[in-house]
Amino acid sequence: FKVADSLYSVAKSMAPYTNHIKNGLLTNIELFFITKKYKDGYFHLGHLERKTFKPKTKNNFKGKVYILTNGPTFSASALFCNAMKGQPGVTLVGEETGGGWYGNNGIIIPDIVLPNTKIRVRLPLFRLLQFEHDKVPQKGTGVIPDIYCGPSLDALIHKVDNKMEAVIKMIRSENSQQ
């Protein structure tokens, strides 16, 4: 599987703001060596755009995999859910992820100190479009699970993880049919 169709930054350097970025010089050096300007005018991380992950053939798990999701599933975990969705033997159970299905911002997220107020903020430098992003909604959704299992008042009151319970029930049902 692949993670990204496109992974790019709008700039190859943080100049003239380097002094306001924690480790700004190192960030500039990193951007210089890991990005390349493409015809679209953006600076791409080509290595990660081309990277294909393949299953290991030795000592690998051959059973079914259930991935639990909910609103706080975002950033790298949303990327993971997108990459796993539709893979043989993988089922996403729970709620829509909080992270974007179409893409995310991140990869390098430097600390920036605003010069007058000294407020510290973090701003992602890269835009990542998920692999096969043309097959998912462009705006407004996270990764949709294969099996929806939302919260319930009763589960909250009794401190029951109803997503985990649903998966346990599915596994037991499958095992009893074998």
Language-model features and meaning:
Residues 1-178:
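C-terminal "post-core" interaction segments
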